[in-house]
Structures are given as structure tokens and as C-alpha cells.
Amino acid sequence: MATQSVLVRRDGVVVDAEGNAAIYFGDVPQGNYCVTVRHRNHFGIRTANALNFIKGVATAFDFTTPTANIYVNPSITSNLPTKTITVAGVDYRTLWTGDINQDGFIKYNGSKNDRSVILLKVGGVLTSTSSGYSAEDVNMNGIAKYNGSLNDRSVLLLNVGGILTNVLKQHL
């Protein structure tokens, strides 16, 4: 197993710290490996099948295409491993956002819900905000916000389909 810290650009392209789209895993031996992508406050996803890594040869996999072979946990029937969005008539797969407490669930209500974590971040004050890089910034605009326009709580509610008791589950 090997890990590599990378950046996910707004357009979904994964790059290394220098902005290169080719991600290197050092001295990982040639072989077949599943690739997993994780991002703060998002569900992780992985390839359904191992990819063949050959030393000196780039291996590409586009997680965003609707036909990408992404792992689906057969015991989870409440949601797919990714969320599909349509931009200019083209469908793209995206990571589910909102797993603020990183427990593998996106919950709006109930115990260990992600909504309450946003409220705690702003000090329990409904109209307060907190700026900076944080897991509570679900919409990734640099501000954790519970109420008002561009609040992070609404993203959670949209992801659970507007049904307060719905729970999304990570497929890893």
C-alpha cells in the first residue's frame, strides 16, 4: 500500500503539490493495485478493479466519467458511491460532500449528524461564520456558515434529498 498527498482542483483534476497531473508513488513495485481517492469532508471512492501499474508508464483513470468502473458496495442500496451532476449537458461523477466528522455517513439529523458539527464550528451562533480551510466548509468557499445564503447546512440537506432522516453511506 502507498499513499500520496495531492490536490483536487475545482475542475476535478488531481495534481501533486507542484501542479503536475502525473502522480508518482515512489518505489511501488509493478503490479495490480486498486486506487482510492479521498478528500476532506467527502466520501472516498476507489476503482472497482485493480489497475496495472508498470514502472515508467503512466496509468490513467478518470473517476468523473459515468462509465468509470467505480467500486459499489453491494450491501449499500441507499445511494451510489458518487453523485452525478450535469454541466452543459454532460454528466460527471463527483464525490459526495458532507461527511464532516469522517464517520462514513452523511447525516442531517440524529446522533453523530454532520449538520451539528457546522453549528459547533460557528460557536453555536446561527448567524456566525468561520473563515479558513475546515471540514465544516462543505461548499468549499472558504467560509463555514450555518444560516443565510451560501450556507453549508443546505448542501447536506440537498445531498440527503431534502429528507431529514435519510443517511448516505460511503462505499469503501
Locate each region found by the language model.
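Cellulosome-associated attachment modules in secreted, modular CAZymes
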Residues: 3-172
